[in-house]
UniProtKB/Swiss-Prot annotation:
<keyword id="KW-0547">Nucleotide-binding</keyword>
<keyword id="KW-0067">ATP-binding</keyword>
<feature type="site" description="Interaction with substrate tRNA">
    <location>
        <position position="119"/>
    </location>
</feature>
<dbReference type="GO" id="GO:0006400">
    <property type="term" value="P:tRNA modification"/>
</dbReference>
<comment type="function">
    <text>Catalyzes the transfer of a dimethylallyl group onto the adenine at position 37 in tRNAs that read codons beginning with uridine, leading to the formation of N6-(dimethylallyl)adenosine (i(6)A).</text>
</comment>
<dbReference type="InterPro" id="IPR039657">
    <property type="entry name" value="Dimethylallyltransferase"/>
</dbReference>
<dbReference type="Pfam" id="PF01715">
    <property type="entry name" value="IPPT"/>
</dbReference>
<keyword id="KW-0460">Magnesium</keyword>
<dbReference type="GO" id="GO:0005524">
    <property type="term" value="F:ATP binding"/>
</dbReference>
<keyword id="KW-0808">Transferase</keyword>
<comment type="subunit">
    <text>Monomer.</text>
</comment>
<dbReference type="GO" id="GO:0052381">
    <property type="term" value="F:tRNA dimethylallyltransferase activity"/>
</dbReference>
<feature type="binding site">
    <location>
        <begin position="7"/>
        <end position="12"/>
    </location>
    <ligand>
        <name>substrate</name>
    </ligand>
</feature>
<protein>
    <recommendedName>
        <fullName>tRNA dimethylallyltransferase</fullName>
        <ecNumber>2.5.1.75</ecNumber>
    </recommendedName>
</protein>
<comment type="similarity">
    <text>Belongs to the IPP transferase family.</text>
</comment>
<dbReference type="InterPro" id="IPR027417">
    <property type="entry name" value="P-loop_NTPase"/>
</dbReference>
<keyword id="KW-0819">tRNA processing</keyword>
């Protein structure tokens, strides 16, 4: 089972409802929720908000530990059969398109793998720190590529770092083209959407609530804990904006504005990514009441998985 869509659309609540109905376990497809101590800025559900449903791929790493989409794929492809063998339905819920697609299409990663969000982050790092700093960072992880790429070749420096962060492998190690295997799993592929202005209203409200709930204190704690602001995790949306505020670059009102703006831009990119996948069955979360929405989604799961899933309302039905 797959539940995707833009940030703030309500994926987590739908995932919990599906897990309750079909005796499922949730696998987070969010690239940032893997990090411990990064809770508010990643909109991570608290334990008491998870409805008693087992959630995986949350709080498994410290913020300074590297984690690529290839790492995610390796962990989740091991996790899925374990869940199935327990008689439960694996439910992949998330908005990080490349992470999700690496599972459902069983990507074999090579240097052609790409992630526009990561590339945008590297572009910002180049603007903030300069190309020489980025080139030195490349030399630390891939000295062969660094030797081949001129210190002023912005595009190639960023691309080499992008490949390394995505795949966990050096660009210089690749000698063949990217390939995508046939889908590995039988899917019930759900995507959530809503009116764009309503989504943006929810995004803006959530950003404000994050700050009111202690996001600034969370980021302060991470910095005091020794996590550098240049870490990939600390450059994520929700953290880089607060880091700028704490470093005196702007006031808190500006930080909130940037957080809201950057999250809206991210939602646009998520829409662009998921709209390319014609397998997804879209539901407008704001166009019907909750009961009708969930019944429609439950029907898709039952029809898509057929005899492999047993719908249950009262007696804890299982994935077969």
């Amino acid at each position: 089972m797959l539940i995707v869509g833009p940030t703030a659309v309500g994926k987590s609540d739908v995932g919990i409802a599906v897990a309750r109905r079909f005796n499922g376990e949730i696998i987070s497809g969010d690239s940032m929720q893997v990090y411990r101590g990064m809770d508010i800025g990643t909109a991570k559900l608290k334990q008491e908000e998870r409805g008693g449903i087992l959630h995986h791929m949350i709080d498994i790493l410290d913020p300074d530990e590297p984690f690529s989409v290839a790492d995610f794929q390796r962990r989740v492809t091991t996790l899925i059969p374990e869940i199935v063998n327990r008689g439960r339905l694996p439910i992949l819920v998330g908005g990080t398109g490349l992470y999700v697609q690496s599972i459902i299409d069983h990507y074999e990663f090579t240097e052609e793998a790409t992630d526009l969000e990561l590339r945008s982050q590297l572009e910002q790092e180049a603007d903030a720190s300069g190309l020489e700093a980025l080139h030195r960072r490349l030399a630390e992880v891939d000295p062969i590529s660094a030797a081949r790429i001129h210190v002023n070749d912005r595009k190639r420096i960023i691309r080499a770092l992008e490949v390394y962060r995505l795949t966990g492998r050096r660009q210089s190690d690749f000698h063949y083209a990217d390939s995508v295997r046939q889908p590995k799993y039988q899917l019930a592929p759900i995507a959530l959407t809503m009116d764009r202005q309503e989504l943006y209203r929810r995004i803006d409200l959530r950003a404000r609530n994050m700050i009111e709930s202690g996001l600034v204190e969370e980021v302060k704690g991470l910095l005091k804990g020794g996590y550098a602001p240049t870490l990939p995790s600390m450059q994520a949306i929700g953290y880089k904006e607060i880091v700028g505020y704490l470093q005196g670059e702007y006031d808190l009102a500006r930080a909130l504005y940037l957080l809201q703006r950057d999250t809206r831009h991210f939602a646009k990119r998520q829409y662009t990514w998921f709209r390319r996948d014609t397998r997804l069955i879209w539901f407008a979360a704001d166009a019907m009441d909750r009961e009708r929405l969930m019944e429609g989604i439950f029907d898709v799961v039952s029809n898509a998985l057929g005899g492999h899933v047993e719908r249950n309302i009262n007696d804890g039905g299982a994935f077969r």
